[in-house]
Amino acid sequence: DAKGQLMPELTASDAKALVPVSLPPVAEPEPLDDPRRGDVDEWGRSERMRSLARTLYAPLYEKWFRVEWEHMDRTPADGGALLVANHAAALPSDAPAIMHGIEVEMGRPVYGLADHFFRSVPVVGTLWARNGGVVAQPDNAYRLLREQGQLALVFPEGTKGPAKTYDERYRLRRFGRGGFVEIAMRAGVPIIPIAVVGAEESMPTLARVPAVAKALGIPYFPITANMLAFG
């Protein structure tokens, strides 16, 4: 079973030991285009699209992945917070599961911070943005957390997490340079660690094919057990 476990929160004050106390001033975010008509916000998120996605995803969430939560109540009911999770599975199921669970149970939108690659893919980039995807840049994260009081989800392992093969499961990859801690401190919001257990088994990667990934211009190309079972 896929199980997401919320661990005790780490507040900005607790994190001071992890990064220098004296931080450079936050750069002013570049102005964004005016929100488009309809229910699409300035980040590209559409609540109508999210509602449709939740309806379509619910059977997978409940019957296939059978997600269970512990301590979701430690996620703030209001105000900004940075959700920090481990990342796994060839096609990561953790991001949509976390976003779906919190939105359904708490009624709060979740914005997923991810690599610019997703935004650049035709069609996929638009769907990604409509469902709460935001390019993972410090200014974007700061604005979401500090100025708008939103929940932002980040996977510090990046693509290195889901690119792991099955024999490397549950071995965390380097969390970048700790930039997410600095952003949370600047924004004055709590960090909510999320431990995802079970995603590694949902779509295990047996091998990677770097040559194919390079040819397609994608971060990695996995050979999965699912491909062998259905292919």
Regions found by a protein language model. Give the residues of each.
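Membrane-anchoring hydrophobic helices of lipid-metabolizing enzymes
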Residues: 4-101, 105-139, 209, 227, ...
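Generic beta-sheet signal
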Residues: 79-85, 113-115, 149-156, 189, 194
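Short glycine-rich anion-binding loops that position phosphate/pyrophosphate groups of nucleotides
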Residues: 88-89, 158-160
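Short acidic, glycine/proline-rich loop/turn micro-motifs
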Residues: 125, 164-168
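Hydrophobic/aromatic ligand-binding patch that stacks against planar heteroaromatic rings
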Residues: 127, 143-144, 182-186
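A cross-family acyltransferase "interaction/gating" segment
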Residues: 168-231
